[in-house]
Amino acid sequence: MISMEQPPETELVSIEINDAICHLKLNREEKFNALNVQLITELCTLFDWTAERSVGRQGELHDSNGIPFLRIMVLSGAGRHFCAGADINMMRDAGANTAEENRIDSERLDRLFNGLWAHPCFTIGAVQGV
C-alpha cells in the first residue's frame, strides 16, 4: 500500500503536503536556486515519489484510510528568484569531465525534465524573479 507519510529526506528541496496539494520549494537561495547535481537529483526523487502518490497513478481520490492522493503539484523557489537555470560552476566543471560523466549528467537532466513533463499531477510554477 502507498503511504503519504515519510517523503524522502532532502536538503535542497522542501516538500509540504496539504490534502491533495504538494508544494515543492527549491531551497538554494544563495545561488538563486541554480540547478546543481544535488538539486537535480533531489527533484527527480521527489517527482518520482509524488507521482506514485498521485490520483493519476493510483486511479483513486483517496487511499483506504481516506487520505487524499495528490492532484496538484506547486513548484516554487525560495528567495527573490525561482531558478537561475544550471549552476555555472557545474557547467564549468563539465568541460573537464569525461564523455561518460557528461553522458550521465545528460541522462540526469533528461530524467528531471521528463519527470516534470510526464508528472500525473496538475503542475503549477510559482515563478518570481529569474
Residue ranges with predicted function:
Residues 1-76:
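Conserved CoA-thioester-binding segment of acyl-CoA-metabolizing enzymes
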Residues 62-69, 77-115:
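Glycine- (often His-adjacent) and acidic-residue-rich active-site loop
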Residues 110-130:
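Glycine-rich beta-to-alpha active-site loop
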